[in-house]
Amino acid sequence: MSLEEFDEVKYDHSTKRLDTPSRYLLRKARRNPNGLQELRESMKSSTIYVGNLSFYTSEEQIYELFSKCGTIKRIIMGLDRFKFTPCGFCFIIYSCPDEALNALKYLSDTKLDEKTITIDLDPGFEDGRQFGRGKSGGQVSDELRFDFDASRGGFAIPFAERVGVPHSRFDNSSSQSNTNNYIPPPDAMGTFRPGFDEEREDDNYVPQ
């Protein structure tokens, strides 16, 4: 599929256009037979995708920040498809495309709840896209994460399950090279976790 019309042309002493697809959208378009049309739609869309949110960030906090860029018609919180709890992303629908571009211009890489959020133009929300697509019900990016992040559920899937290695290989009889790679599940760490000894309370968000 040719995406020549979306190739970025760089000029000296110029600023980057906002109504251009991100590298993620370009990769997605190349795998999708209808990708070119979706790219064109996203460039004139009133919808944005917001990623890397804390699981504890509420819809009210998102509205307070993003309403500074225009009139918000709807916010769709991303949910774990099994637990129906927030899983770190959302869609925001503005009343016109210019307001979506305002959000992209002024709020990209902003910190919300101590997380640097990402913003991307979106072709438009469809029912079903609010659910995580990962094996555990959340986002795929969290399942590929190896570090502990309290704002995004702590550890994701145990290391052994992610790489497909039987748990028996991580017992006391395993070789040193194997045990060095083991990442314990959250319940194996006890109640004290360095840097996270004060647990944040779960919010009372109820998906509408």
Curated annotation (Swiss-Prot):
Keyword Protein biosynthesis: no
Residue ranges with Polar residues bias: 171-182
Native organism: Saccharomyces cerevisiae (strain ATCC 204508 / S288c) (Baker's yeast)
Highest taxon above the source species: Eukaryota
One term of GO molecular function: RNA cap binding
Binding site for mRNA: 24, 49, 118-122, 129-133, 139-140
Keywords of this entry: Cytoplasm, mRNA processing, mRNA splicing, mRNA transport, Nonsense-mediated mRNA decay, Nucleus, RNA-binding, Transport
A GO biological-process term: mRNA transcription by RNA polymerase II
CC per GO annotation: commitment complex; nuclear cap binding complex; nucleus; perinuclear region of cytoplasm
Matches recorded under Gene3D superfamilies: 3.30.70.330
Quaternary assembly: Component of the nuclear cap-binding complex (CBC), a heterodimer composed of STO1/CBC1 and CBC2 that interacts with capped RNAs. The complex interacts strongly with the importin subunit alpha SRP1. The SRP1-CBC trimer also binds to capped RNAs, but formation of the importin alpha/beta heterodimer upon binding of KAP95 to SRP1 in the cytoplasm causes dissociation of CBC from the RNA. The CBC complex is part of the commitment complex 1 (CC1), binding to the cap of pre-mRNA and interacting with U1 snRNP subunits MUD2 and SNU56.
Described function: Component of the CBC complex, which binds co-transcriptionally to the cap of pre-mRNAs and is involved in maturation, export and degradation of nuclear mRNAs. The CBC complex is required for efficient pre-mRNA splicing through efficient commitment complex and spliceosome formation. Together with NPL3, the CBC complex is required for export of mRNAs out of the nucleus. The CBC complex is also involved in nuclear mRNA degradation, probably by directing the mRNAs to the sites of degradation. Affects replication of the positive-strand RNA virus BMV.
Domain RRM residues, every copy: 46-124
Protein name (database record): Nuclear cap-binding protein subunit 2
Family recorded in the similarity comment: Belongs to the RRM NCBP2 family.
